[in-house]
């Protein structure tokens, strides 16, 4: 980690807005080989596009079709028996993902499970952590959070008998800017902290790519 931090610091100190410098960084990129693992959209002339929308929808891995076809083939041949006898049995499928997921979140394999959809998981989380009362009932969220996140939050607010328009606080960027300033987030928390029951900010905003 320290080596990577030192390298990033060196890059920031020697940064140049030139094609040569960008090419040099590409050659030094230890992850560059993974580029070949994905399909990259092309323009009308067949040139690969520069894709900067991974925070919204990632590129398709080249192995995806083969993986999906394997499951469809097992379904066709095995039917319900696929739950136990497919190449990747469906019943314990989540166990195949726990180890890699644990590395991403920094937990133990026994502590991590892949389940449901994002929206369902948000509802499960808010059932536990959103406990509004008369004084403290507001939810703080990004103004441009993923639409289904907003739907889930509004649903929970209504479920507890409150009006979303009065209860949901949306963080917006300043006029002419694309990301929310940290100091603006802190200011809202200072001003509304006694009224806020839940703060829900995504790790990476799907629309702007801002990291929180």
Q: Language-model segments: which ranges?
A:
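Pyridoxal 5′-phosphate
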Residues: 2-212
């Amino acid at each position: 980690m320290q080596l990577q931090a030192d390298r990033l610091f060196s890059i920031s100190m020697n940064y140049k807005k030139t094609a040569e410098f960008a090419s040099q960084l590409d050659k030094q990129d230890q992850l560059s080989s993974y580029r070949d693992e994905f399909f990259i959209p092309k323009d009308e002339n067949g040139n690969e596009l520069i894709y900067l929308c991974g925070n919204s929808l990632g590129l398709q891995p080249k192995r995806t079709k083969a993986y999906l076809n394997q499951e469809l083939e097992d379904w066709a041949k095995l039917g319900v028996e696929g739950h136990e006898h497919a190449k990747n049995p469906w019943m314990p499928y989540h166990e195949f993902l726990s180890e890699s997921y644990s590395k991403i979140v920094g937990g133990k394999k026994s502590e991590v499970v892949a389940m449901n959809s994002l929206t369902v998981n948000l509802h499960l989380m808010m059932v536990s952590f959103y406990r509004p009362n008369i004084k403290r009932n507001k939810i703080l969220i990004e103004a441009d959070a993923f639409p289904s996140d907003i739907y889930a939050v509004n649903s929970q607010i209504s479920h507890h008998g409150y009006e979303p328009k009065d209860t949901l606080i949306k963080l917006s960027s300043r006029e002419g800017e694309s990301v929310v300033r940290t100091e603006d987030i802190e200011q809202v928390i200072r001003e509304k902290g006694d009224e806020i029951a839940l703060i829900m900010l995504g790790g990476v905003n799907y629309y702007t790519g801002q990291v929180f």
